[in-house]
Amino acid sequence: MAMQLSLSHQSWAKSLASPITSFDPARSPPKRVELGPNCLNGGATAGKLMREKVGERMRMSGRSCCVKASLETAVGAESETLVGKVTEVDKDTFWPIANGAGDKPVVLDMYTQWCGPCKVMAPKYQELAEKLLDVVFLKLDCNQENKPLAKELGIRVVPTFKILKGGKIVDEVTGAKFDKLVAAIEAARSS
């Protein structure tokens, strides 16, 4: 999924009017950070506030804090519109979307372009996404570009389906086993 983000001064002000969740590359529990109008100027106050509240994990100038904060707000808002469809993700967009889903189960289809069983599962996976509106359905092309994420998630065969809840992997289905996938999703929905 390629996310296009266009920010004007007004959109920055709107997205930064309320608290945001800070970016944490280690994916530890998110921290709340308040940014105000000083961030619009890229002033030192915003950068200082960000460093004081978040600590050394985030090394950014005030202006880049604004952009990152606005991006995170956009990703959080976008995760609400992900229901009812399958969304293509990559190594940069997967974790923000998965963590932004809150209590909704997230199902990640890890596939390759050349995989026959992956192609068989794709329309069935799409039907599930249209039917189960309380679940976020994602797919990741396990190409060279996304290899670091595939390795992090422990993929060994394609297709592999990872089921996450609360940003943590709760189940895995390997191969084109549709019935097992449905059962794993139902278990995640009811937990």
Swiss-Prot record:
Question: Where are the active-site residues found?
Answer: 115 (nucleophile), 118 (nucleophile)
Q: Which residues form the Thioredoxin domain?
A: 68-190
Instruction: Give site residues, Contributes to redox potential value.
Output: 116-117
What are the protein's UniProt keywords? Chloroplast, Disulfide bond, Electron transport, Plastid, Redox-active center, Transit peptide, Transport
- What's one GO-annotated cellular component? chloroplast
Which residues does the annotation list for site: Deprotonates C-terminal active site Cys?
A: 109
Signal sequence span is none
One Pfam family assigned to this protein is Thioredoxin
Coiled-coil stretches: none
UniProt superkingdom = Eukaryota
Main location group: plastid
Disulfide pairs? 115-118
Q: Which InterPro entries match?
A: Thioredoxin-like_sf, Thioredoxin_CS, Thioredoxin_domain
Q: Does the keyword Electron transport apply?
A: yes
Location in or out of the cell: Plastid, Chloroplast
Briefly state the protein's biological role.
Participates in various redox reactions through the reversible oxidation of the active center dithiol to a disulfide. The F form is known to activate a number of enzymes of the photosynthetic carbon cycle.
- Family statement drawn from the similarity comment of this UniProt entry: Belongs to the thioredoxin family. Plant F-type subfamily.
Subunit details for this protein? Forms a complex with heterodimeric ferredoxin-thioredoxin reductase (FTR) and ferredoxin.
Name the UniProt record assigns to this protein: Thioredoxin F-type, chloroplastic
Organism, as annotated: Mesembryanthemum crystallinum
Taxonomy, top ranks, is: Eukaryota, Viridiplantae, Streptophyta, Embryophyta, Tracheophyta
